[in-house]
Amino acid sequence: MTPPVAYPGPPGTHTAAAAAALFPSGPHLPVTGFRAVADAVLAADAAFGVLPIESSLAGSVAETHDLLYERSLSIVGETILPVTHCLVAAGPLELAEVRTVHSHPAALEQCRDLLARLPG
């Protein structure tokens, strides 16, 4: 059996899409976080790990850089993944009416310029 490629899951995330782009035939192994990806690779539970290293919107991904510094890991490939965010609501709503936005911290950081311009 081919060893899996670990990525911080769950399926459907941007890292899952990056893993599929880099390793289209899989298998893919969703794990609980960035450190779990490094642990899986170092324990040989995964052949490779896929982690974000930079965002054109939010800059360097510090946790990935920390893991590369702390552990015996090397970058052996890369892919560029276009990311689009959507601001959605339960019903019709004007941007001026938006009061609270809930999302993953990375997505909030990537959208900080738009969020700062919201009037509410």
Give the location of each predicted region.
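Domain-level signature for soluble enzymes in the chorismate/prephenate branch of the shikimate pathway
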Residues: M1-G120
